[in-house]
């Protein structure tokens, strides 16, 4: 079973929609962390931008769920267009212990 750690960084007002996309694909656990952009005040003012609050939404998904999530994020949130956020999938090559694997996959694979 291929597992991926999915991470999406986007504006906070999109966090609820991202979480809904993750849940619709059948992921069991979604973690949302609040953050802020890393640009300095000088950088923001030189480009005429305002500071934005961010949300980091993450989950663990199998290969099919990962494809569904990426497809839905492209269609609904236009995540593949610059300025709408960043989404990445990090492959999990090993998981220590059967219980951990069961927890991450909602006991579908132990």
Predicted segment positions?
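Positively charged, small/polar-rich N-terminal and surface patches that mediate targeting and assembly
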Residues: 1-110
């Amino acid at each position: 079973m291929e597992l991926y750690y999915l991470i999406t960084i986007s504006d906070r007002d999109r966090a609820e929609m991202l979480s809904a996309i993750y849940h619709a694909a059948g992921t069991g656990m979604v973690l949302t962390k609040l953050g802020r952009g890393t640009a300095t005040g000088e950088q923001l003012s030189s480009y005429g931008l305002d500071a934005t609050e961010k949300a980091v939404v993450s989950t663990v998904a199998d290969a099919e769920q990962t494809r569904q999530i990426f497809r839905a994020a492209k269609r609904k949130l236009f995540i593949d267009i610059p300025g709408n956020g960043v989404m990445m999938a990090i492959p999990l090559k090993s998981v220590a212990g059967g219980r951990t694997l069961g927890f991450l996959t909602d006991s579908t694979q132990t």
